[in-house]
Amino acid sequence: MAIEKATKGQDYLKTLIKEFPSSHAIKNCATSDYDGLVMSFRSSLGELVVDPISANYDARVAGDGPQACDRELANEKIVNPSVSKMNNEMTFLSDVAYLATNYLRK
């Protein structure tokens, strides 16, 4: 679920690049920030059985991308409630994945 939501979120951000071509923040959100989010969720899922400690770490750092996106948007004084909501949801999913994988380590 998290991978699918993150991918859809990244697709949405890519449409915003076309609407705001001069925004470095939106470009970073759509590329590096959400690339990291999707890759971390995928990596965490792939490591669940073989390396639960790494899966736990990747679940935690997945939330870094959406948080960075929020900071970048704030620095450019861009207010977009749908992106803020999406970033909050992605951070929440990262927290849930972290807690779930933390439980598996025990």
Regions found by a protein language model. Name each.
Residues 1-106:
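Folded extracytoplasmic luminal domains of secretory or organellar precursors
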